[in-house]
């Protein structure tokens, strides 16, 4: 919420609208509405700039860590979001674990993430990196030590 699509191709526009309607994540709510108003105000401008710096560093750190330390897990550095989409297909195949087992192992060590299947990722997990860097580091270390073993 708070982003805009400019789609000139009518067929692509219809497809984009159809896909975005399949999830409640594309619906405005009271909190997101006020956050959007604040972000576009003069007072919100500096805060948004600082936030973008933090989120960019979080994403860079997490992607580099995952590529180096979590064999069988792949990730693409996102453009314009703080959500990672971890592809666990190779890890699950090699380890014999299901995606549900991997998700549960993360929850058990305090890493709260989201099933990627509702977002068209059959073997994916969504991870939100909108938090302080120290928490990102702790989460990555826990994934390496306890989950993707």
Name the predicted role of every residue range.
Residues 1-149:
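PLP-dependent class I/II
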């Amino acid at each position: 919420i708070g982003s805009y699509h400019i789609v000139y191709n009518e067929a692509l526009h219809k497809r984009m609208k159809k896909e975005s309607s399949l999830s409640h994540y594309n619906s405005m709510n009271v909190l997101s509405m006020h956050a959007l108003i604040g972000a576009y105000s003069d007072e919100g401008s500096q805060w948004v700039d600082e936030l973008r710096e933090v989120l960019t560093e979080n994403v860079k750190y997490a992607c580099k860590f995952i590529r180096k330390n979590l064999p069988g897990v792949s990730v693409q550095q996102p453009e314009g979001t703080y959500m990672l989409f971890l592809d666990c297909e190779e890890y699950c195949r090699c380890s014999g674990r299901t995606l549900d087992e991997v998700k549960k192992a993360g929850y058990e060590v305090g890493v709260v993430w989201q099933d990627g299947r509702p977002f068209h990722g059959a073997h994916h997990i969504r991870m939100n990196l909108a938090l302080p860097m120290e928490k990102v580091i702790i989460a990555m270390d826990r994934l390496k030590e306890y989950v993707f073993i």
